[in-house]
UniProtKB/Swiss-Prot annotation:
The gene is malK. Pfam families: HATPase_c (PF02518), PAS (PF00989), sCache_3_2 (PF17203), SPOB_a (PF14689). PROSITE patterns: HIS_KIN (PS50109). Residues 33-172 are extracellular. The lineage of its organism: Bacteria, Bacillati, Bacillota, Bacilli, Bacillales. One of its GO terms (cellular component) is plasma membrane. This is Sensor histidine kinase MalK. Member of a two-component regulatory system MalK/MalR. Involved in the activation of maeA, maeN and yflS in presence of malate. Probably activates MalR by phosphorylation. It comes from Bacillus subtilis (strain 168). The modification Phosphohistidine is found at H338. Keywords: ATP-binding, Cell membrane, Kinase, Membrane, Nucleotide-binding, Phosphoprotein, Transferase, Transmembrane, Transmembrane helix, Two-component regulatory system. InterPro entries: HATPase_C_sf (IPR036890), His_kinase_dom (IPR005467), Histidine_kinase_MalK-like (IPR053609), PAS (IPR000014), PAS_fold (IPR013767), sCache_3 (IPR033463), Sensor-like_sf (IPR029151), Sig_transdc_His_kin-like_C (IPR004358). Residues 210-281 form the PAS domain.
Length: 533
């Protein structure tokens, strides 16, 4: 696997390169401008010096008369020293030097070949090589009082001297560039570390992986997820949330919309203000019942938004009913197993005691009892799932010290829709459990259940000999979480009512103090067509 540089290293290198490029551009730009400025200044100095010497009366007089050569030599040396030029040469119309920094060169022809223009009366500047090396020269003609040209002045500054001046002028820039590079490297490291900290120390590929995992989780979850910023604007809605929006009749794109415009019953803004979560809140929107959980999003102690998770309440209820049904199956099987083990222990004891006559009588009693209990249920209840559940429930109730009588007034056919059986198990199981709780402290612990099927209607009646319920309890008994038996109770009858509503049935509660309670249920029930080949 190819090893890649870490983000901090890459950022440091990148920022350093950017800083270096910027500094190099600055250096070359400033350097070029400085070089041009110095060269222009040197040209101006040479030209001004040449003009000053050419206009001096002594120069024209010496060239015209051929006298005062020493005075002219002394004058040009003073000018050369004052102006800092390399040489000041006065020549006649034949190009013969009259002055020169090196006296041995006086009287000889001017070297360079660029003096011809000035001898024709033209002022010009050029670069050429002479006895003192390559230099930048300014040429100015000398005129007598009568206006006749009598010679010329050449003032030069060597290229080496100009380069030295340029180099000296650029030295501070070299220092500034080096310091800037050093500061840039430190700044790059600081920027890279800051960015790394902002990204919680994660590398780009790690962030990409987290985003992919987050997206996969959001889109695969069965709950709608909605995230808003601190202003209540929707910033995220997963696929399930959008599906539920469609079921609510909301077909607009929720992103960047105000949450109150999309979900008027949302409490996300309140959650942001109070910084307190709201959990398991029942909400009905456009006929769709939802279970909402809303929590604030906090970052470094600041609330930066909120998240809502919501699900179709009917789906949640269906899951709860399935879990309730499984639990009932397990309890029934456990009770039946426990009862049979007790009977086997009795049989084993009678065998060991060799009480074979008593053993025979005991087995006959068990057979008669089992036949009387099971024959009606097995013969009349055609759904094996429901029949097995009822038999197991009888054993469980008996194990708890109570008695459950089940009467079938005619045949109860199997349901055409298997989900109806699961709903019935939820209804019957919860009502029998409620009856068991009611008779727990009563001297007579009797629960009676009857079923009757007629004209696609299933009637169920469950009666207990408990203490009964007051009118106040009867009014609240089907509310979620309401119970007279303490905390973490009050869900059985609530789910029972929901299951009956799902089946489009109805339930009547009749209860009197010290007389017991009766639940009467009527449910539409389509029988399954049986094949009789």
């Amino acid at each position: 696997m190819k090893k890649t540089l870490k983000l901090q290293t890459r950022l440091t290198i990148f920022v350093c390169i950017v800083v270096l490029i910027a500094l190099l551009i600055t250096f070359f730009t400033v350097g070029a401008q400085t070089t041009k400025r110095i060269r222009d200044q040197e040209k101006a100095t040479a030209l001004q010096t040449a003009e000053m010497v050419a206009e001096a009366p002594m120069t024209a007089a010496a060239l015209e008369s051929g006298k005062k050569q020493k005075e002219l030599q002394s004058y040009t040396k003073r000018v050369q020293k004052i102006t800092g030029t390399e040489f000041v040469v006065v020549m006649d119309m034949n190009g013969i030097r009259k002055t020169h920094p090196d006296p041995s060169k006086i009287g000889k022809k001017f070297r360079g070949g660029d003096e011809s223009e000035v001898l024709k009366g033209h002022v010009h500047i050029s670069t050429a090589s002479g006895t003192l090396g390559k230099s930048q020269r300014a040429f100015v003609p000398v005129y007598a009082e009568n206006g006749k040209q009598v010679g010329a002045v050449a003032v030069g500054i060597t290229v080496n001297e100009i380069d030295e001046v340029i180099s000296h002028s650029l030295r501070p820039l070299y220092f500034i560039i080096c310091v800037s590079i050093f500061v840039g490297v430190i700044g790059a490291v600081i920027v890279a570390r800051t960015v790394k900290n902002i990204m919680y120390g994660l590398e780009p590929y790690e962030i990409a992986t987290l985003l992919e995992e987050r997206s996969a989780m959001l889109e695969s979850t069965k709950e709608g997820i909605l995230a808003v910023d601190e202003h209540g604007k929707i910033k995220l809605a997963n696929a399930e949330a959008k599906r539920l929006f469609v079921k609510m009749g909301i077909n607009t794109n929720p992103i960047d919309q105000d949450v109150d415009d999309i979900l008027p019953k949302s409490r996300l803004k309140k959650v942001i203000e109070t910084k307190k979560p709201l959990q398991d809140r029942d909400v009905r929107i456009n006929g769709l019942e939802l279970v909402f959980n809303e929590v604030p999003i906090q970052l470094k102690g600041q609330t930066v938004g909120a998240i809502a998770t919501f699900r179709d309440k009917t789906e949640v209820k269906h899951l709860a009913e399935q879990l309730s049904g499984v639990k009932m199956y397990a309890n029934a099987l456990r009770a039946q197993s426990h009862e049979f083990m007790n009977k086997l222990h009795v049989i084993l004891g009678l065998v060991q005691l060799k009480e074979y006559d008593d053993l025979g009588d005991y087995i006959k009693d068990i057979a008669i009892q089992q036949k009387s209990e099971t024959s009606e249920i097995i013969n009349d209840v055609k759904s094996s799932v429901l029949a097995g559940f009822l038999l197991g429930k009888q054993s469980f109730i008996r194990e708890q010290g109570a008695n459950l009588d089940i009467e079938c007034n005619g045949v109860i056919p199997n349901a055409a829709d298997p989900s109806v059986i699961h709903e019935l198990i939820t209804i019957i199981g919860n009502l029998i459990n409620n009856g068991l709780d009611a008779v727990a402290d009563m001297p007579k612990k009797q629960i009676t259940m009857s079923m009757r099927f007629h004209n696609s209607i299933l009637d169920i009646e469950i009666t207990d000999t408990g203490a009964g319920m007051s009118e106040e309890d009867q009014a609240k008994v089907f509310e979620q979480g309401y119970s007279t038996k303490g905390k973490n109770r009050g869900f059985g009858l609530y789910f029972t009512q929901q299951s009956i509503e799902n089946l489009k049935g109805q339930m009547i509660l009749t209860s009197e103090k010290n007389e017991g309670t009766t639940f009467s249920i009527r449910i539409p029930y389509e029988p399954k067509e049986e094949n009789h080949d």
